[in-house]
């Protein structure tokens, strides 16, 4: 079993909602392990090993009864964050790299704005793998923003 070590020495909490993602959750959480960011996992009813695997990376695992509302689940996860800024990601996503100096500079210079991250979607098809790159809103001050919309949720003030 991996020893849980979260330094919580940065101003950011990473919030993740999940359900039955035992094949993805370790890669997701491990990708943030060296950042020192707080990790928050809101589980919406896993029946596989997702929560057990997540417990190897964080003690901050919360149950959220699924109510057919992605915004409600994400807002619940954000409410558990100890830090003023959050990054919200899905459990099948992972961090490739992060420039903490640039992140902290962005937050300091634009405290009332939403930060965007570049997501690379890898789509497998009969023609092989294709990449779709897009910028999405994922970093924000938890006291100023929240999610709205049951499906295709969006960050709003």
Regions found by a protein language model. Name each.
Residues 2-11:
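Extreme N-terminus of proteins, especially the signal/transit-peptide cleavage junction
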Residues 10-11, 72-78, 84, 89, ...:
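Catalytic-site signature of metal-activated, phosphate-bearing donor transferases
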Residues 16, 37-45, 62, 91:
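Short beta-strand/loop segment that forms part of the nucleotide-sugar
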Residues 16-35:
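Short, well-formed alpha-helical segments that are part of the catalytic scaffolds
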Residues 23-26, 48-57, 98:
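Acidic helix N-cap motif at the loop->helix transition within catalytic regions
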Residues 26, 33, 45, 65, ...:
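Active-site-proximal cofactor/substrate-binding loop regions of enzyme domains
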Residues 31, 43-52, 66, 90:
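A conserved acidic beta->alpha catalytic loop
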Residues 37, 51-76, 80:
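Conserved donor nucleotide-binding strand/loop of the catalytic core
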């Amino acid at each position: 079993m991996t020893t849980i070590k979260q330094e919580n020495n940065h101003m950011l909490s990473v919030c993740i909602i999940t359900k039955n993602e035992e094949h993805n959750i370790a890669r997701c959480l491990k990708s943030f392990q060296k950042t020192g960011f707080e990790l928050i996992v809101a589980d919406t009813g896993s029946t596989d090993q997702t929560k057990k695997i997540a417990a190897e990376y964080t003690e901050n695992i919360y149950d959220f009864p699924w109510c057919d509302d992605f915004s409600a689940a994400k807002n619940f996860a954000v409410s558990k964050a100890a830090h003023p800024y959050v990054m919200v990601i899905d459990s099948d996503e992972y961090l490739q790299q992060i420039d903490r100096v640039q992140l902290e500079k962005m937050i300091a210079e634009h405290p009332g704005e939403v930060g965007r991250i570049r997501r690379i979607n890898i789509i497998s098809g009969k023609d092989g793998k294709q990449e779709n790159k897009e910028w999405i809103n994922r970093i924000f001050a938890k006291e100023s923003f929240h999610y709205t919309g049951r499906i295709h949720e969006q960050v709003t003030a």
